[in-house]
């Protein structure tokens, strides 16, 4: 330890500086010194001294957090005896010092929880020494309220700690601990918590007493943590509320069949202050979400009846719901009524008619008070959406009454949104229309609700639309109209256009009638008439939100009524013909294109409208029949012949805008490329005519690059716009004929300009990203479009350019030096990721024979591969998995390299090989299934290569192993632990996890076993011996059957036999391990 950290007094002073000082320099120096202290050899003993003799709470906090780090480290872990001593010391410390600062108590409880979790499978004299949590806290629970709070908090924190995976330990180990804790301890903790809550609620708690206040809060947190436990390892995304089934184990059935458990929480809700109620309701949300299969039909009906009664009681006494947190949780509870139970079950509940009336009134009132808890509306709309969607399927004879209440909900939503417009504008409030994501989510829900009793929805929309449209027209014609009045009507019309688009988008083909299609026609006519009015005023004024609503409407209309699947006899088209003279789909498409051109002309500098407009054009260009109709329109021919900034301002070089604003150009040119291809065929003149603006742009950049001094900003903007345009065209040209025209146009004339741009601006991702993405698209053999003639060297020439760009970018980006963590992806890793994708596309495109490079002394392949290695070694392992796009590009490239270029992998330095193998090992447990599957494939190729080389080396052959293979074998023999670790990981996942890619996992496993037969035998014995005595024979038999009929080779027939055996093995092991609470006491299995 450093000299200046010698005494406790000095340590305490450093803690004070760290937590109290306002001077940044002093705090940083204290932090640095304390980091040294944490890493020092005598940290453990000093921590104990700080806890024993420290005079400040900060020094106690430091000691607790340092000890937590010490027990959590994976390298050089503390011995078992020492960890037992720390656990016992912490419990005694908490038991003898009830008056510690809250944050110190919390830190010590966290330390206890961490030790317990990480030592869950540690044994001493056949005793799992860290599994006595309930015994550990009993003495706290039998003491005063202060001690009782500590005991409950320990259980709560432990449950939470075991439920959460951490990045420093493998996910397989986490799931193993969580499963064992669930089976051995969690139900006892839940039962204890409920019993303590019953005792507390029966005692008429004195909630003015701060300590009793705290006890109730901790008990509710503990109960919620138990119910919120990830029982089967599926809750990887905690932000999602959609997967709302709680997978309660069958052994918990008794607690939920007993109605007093449910009743306890409803009673608590009514008897405690509103500040505690949100936690009670959170528990009820989880209880309402228990899996359906926990009950039989009669039990479920009884449980649902109690649940509905409890909800009814809350709705009849809604005073506490004025608290936003209570209201939010109660809305979540209502949503679970339909997500977990069927409408046919709900209508059979005795009080259903009264409850559905109360829920409808509550929903209508909530929607009318739109400014109160807007984030909770999602749950209410979710309930009604699910109810409405169930109406066609309900078979129960009891009335569901939704035909009465659903229109009320629809009306409340529509009228409340319209009424909000004036208040928001008058008071300068935040406009919900600004949050298009939230609006879209609500409209998706309303689309189903509104189609229930659709004639009522349409009548309301027609009435409201006509009123607003008439008022709007009158205001526009009036010279004295105030801007405020115009803005109000535009806001109302914006909501109505969004809602009309939504209800049209909610049309379901099998449930729609001619009358409903005619109603859709009425609504569409009105929106198109409004569009004609607003478009005629665009030269003077426009409303961005209304335009975005129009685009949303067009998108919904396109999905339902335009395309190959739509019946052209639809009553909607008849109505459009009568009112607007639009007789068929081609005429409607001309309206679409007219609107698209108008938007691009008048809104070219408004990014949201431009990008949505271009997305609409792009979607139209995908349909087989619609794209052929579009090409015949004069407006589309105008676009194909005049795609310049003169006609479309967003294509201009605007020095005020950001370079990233040009992204939409790719979408534009993808659509134009598809439209051009319809009639292009082999017409090179038409192609060259189309490319004239891009040719001029390339020539302009070439001219700038040829001079020593040029306007860098102008050059950057011209080039970035150009490469984004080209990428759109390259993506659209997925046929050989058209793509060859593009290739011959760009190579060799313009390729040097792209290389020069990378050379000049490698440090500016706004320039390099579009250039690299264009190159990655050009080398992508999409739809086999890169098929060169047998006499053409173009495949090799294209790869040379690819290699040159990767090498140039890679060597220069590595000169950036240290990049701040928050900028490392944008400045470095994103470009590297695209290079990996580019190299993968080139290597797997099947248009280059890579054997010729070495044969003719061409270093293009070697340069690209060596640059890949340099770039890879500059990336920490953690980053490879932390950034999803980088993960996918790296592992898919590695898959190609291990499949086709194993000789290159074998020739690498030992530390590089170990780096690659480590990355595969870590990727095997990745949450992303694509990454995990890719790693299995890489591992399979490596193991197969190793096995073949090993087989050859043992045979008497005239041709010896080449130098690379020999060295690779030697490295792997020196470091068997890496392959053994992966064998252990794969086996662990197959046996103990919810393995979603079992076939992929099975492919490398046979090779791993054949390469490590002794290790596999030890591992098998370890797993068998870890089972309860009565299950060991069954487990042994499972392993015997796994290798039944398997030969010592990796021929396809043998592999397939093994894969079949493995499927049976997994089923048998799962059956054998059911009801077993024992874990695998093996360091290899757990690491």
UniProtKB/Swiss-Prot annotation:
Residues 30-96 form the Importin N-terminal domain. SUPFAM superfamilies: ARM repeat. InterPro entries: ARM-like (IPR011989), ARM-type_fold (IPR016024), Importin-beta_N (IPR001494), XPO4/7-like (IPR044189). It holds the Pfam family IBN_N. The modification Phosphoserine is found at residue 570. It comes from the Eukaryota. Keywords: Acetylation, Cytoplasm, mRNA transport, Nuclear pore complex, Nucleus, Phosphoprotein, Protein transport, Translocation, Transport. It is found in: Cytoplasm; Nucleus; Nucleus, Nuclear pore complex. GO terms for cellular component: cytoplasm; nuclear pore. The modification N-acetylalanine is found at residue 2. GO terms for biological process: mRNA transport; protein export from nucleus. GO terms for molecular function: nuclear export signal receptor activity; small GTPase binding. Belongs to the exportin family. Binds to nucleoporins. Found in a complex with XPO7, EIF4A1, ARHGAP1, VPS26A, VPS29, VPS35 and SFN. Interacts with ARHGAP1 and SFN. Interacts with Ran and cargo proteins in a GTP-dependent manner. Mediates the nuclear export of proteins (cargos) with broad substrate specificity. In the nucleus binds cooperatively to its cargo and to the GTPase Ran in its active GTP-bound form. Docking of this trimeric complex to the nuclear pore complex (NPC) is mediated through binding to nucleoporins. Upon transit of a nuclear export complex into the cytoplasm, disassembling of the complex and hydrolysis of Ran-GTP to Ran-GDP (induced by RANBP1 and RANGAP1, respectively) cause release of the cargo from the export receptor. This is Exportin-7.
